[in-house]
């Protein structure tokens, strides 16, 4: 008799995705981040659900309800900080996952890659609307500044901003709808994740060499289930350490002050995971130009498969491309640092140079060096 997991309609899907899935035998720990992102998503949905049971999306009570969760609800402080720091872990895993894709040429699976970019945008939107909910100073002013960017769109900009606000400023209507968005988006993300996996399993996983590994596959379980469990334990350990020892390390102290439309904080800045994009936005002295650069800094990922000029898929055997890749990582870290600094000399010029380098590396230098590497292969 055939095993039920191979015949039952539902079990069969799970079996083909997580148990008997043929997987390359040589994928490294950089391939762990996919499952870690799944774990982060489940964790965020669960902690978020319990927070939503006690949170009130109203301007007069939102801040107090978060304080109530932290003070009066059993382990409320723990759930709240798990959720806040869980978002940081989510983005660390996301950026590592994207970096892996760039390094090893996983973007050549175009459908999987494009769904991935869409997922990145959706997660960023979710994090943004979520940050507004505690209704602290940085929540309010962050929402005001970022939604205001849409007013740079010619002709319809102002109307669009007021439509999103539900009034003439960020107010009760804005908070209520942002809570609604923050609740629905993770479920949209879950659906997109299923599509992401569907497309991935059409082609099978890439591997560090970038060479097809169809002749050397092993079952996902037990080899990679055990490897993923190790990754998950390390992720949980990091998250718990952050949550229990320094829960506010990555947060902004300004968000412990209730939102006040009459008092602007000295330095308005987003959470650390948006700082690189914020630095690119600020580096252009024109509003529309800044907004376009901000959008392009993320959407440029869509064009990466078209910019592939190398004859090799992976960067594993391409030392010059590796050098440029790590330069790009250093540049992104520089932009992240600049995004958190005030707009004054020398940060302005450093931010502008780092922004130029970011686009130059992706659009010009990396495709060019790949062509040179192709020539070197012929020697």
Swiss-Prot record:
Q: Which residues bind a ubiquinone?
A: 201
Gene Ontology terms for molecular function? metal ion binding; ubiquinol-cytochrome-c reductase activity
Which UniProt keywords are given for this protein, alphabetically ordered?
Answer: Electron transport, Heme, Iron, Membrane, Metal-binding, Mitochondrion, Mitochondrion inner membrane, Respiratory chain, Transmembrane, Transmembrane helix, Transport, Ubiquinone
The cofactor binding remark recorded in the entry reads:
Binds 2 heme b groups non-covalently.
Which cofactor names does the annotation list?
A: heme b
Entry keyword Heme: yes
Gene Ontology annotations for the cellular component aspect, listed alphabetically: mitochondrial inner membrane; respiratory chain complex III
Topology with regard to the membrane? Multi-pass membrane protein
Residues that hold heme b b566 according to the record: 97, 196
UniProt-annotated location(s): Mitochondrion inner membrane
List the transmembrane segments: 33-53, 77-98, 113-133, 178-198, 226-246, 288-308, 320-340, 347-367
- What InterPro entries is this protein classified in? Cyt_b/b6_C, Cyt_b/b6_C_sf, Cyt_b/b6_N, Cytb/b6-like_sf, Cytochrome_b, Cytochrome_b_C_euk/bac, Cytochrome_b_N_euk/bac, Di-haem_cyt_TM
**What biological processes does GO assign it?**
mitochondrial electron transport, ubiquinol to cytochrome c
Family matches, as Gene3D superfamilies: Cytochrome Bc1 Complex, Chain C
Cite the binding residues for heme b b562.
83, 182
Main function: Component of the ubiquinol-cytochrome c reductase complex (complex III or cytochrome b-c1 complex) that is part of the mitochondrial respiratory chain. The b-c1 complex mediates electron transfer from ubiquinol to cytochrome c. Contributes to the generation of a proton gradient across the mitochondrial membrane that is then used for ATP synthesis.
* Binding partners and assembly: The cytochrome bc1 complex contains 11 subunits: 3 respiratory subunits (MT-CYB, CYC1 and UQCRFS1), 2 core proteins (UQCRC1 and UQCRC2) and 6 low-molecular weight proteins (UQCRH/QCR6, UQCRB/QCR7, UQCRQ/QCR8, UQCR10/QCR9, UQCR11/QCR10 and a cleavage product of UQCRFS1). This cytochrome bc1 complex then forms a dimer.
Q: What else is known?
A: Heme 1 (or BL or b562) is low-potential and absorbs at about 562 nm, and heme 2 (or BH or b566) is high-potential and absorbs at about 566 nm.
Annotated family: Belongs to the cytochrome b family.
Write the protein's name. Answer: Cytochrome b
- Organism of origin is Grampus griseus
Taxonomy of the source species: Eukaryota, Metazoa, Chordata, Craniata, Vertebrata
Identify the coding gene: MT-CYB
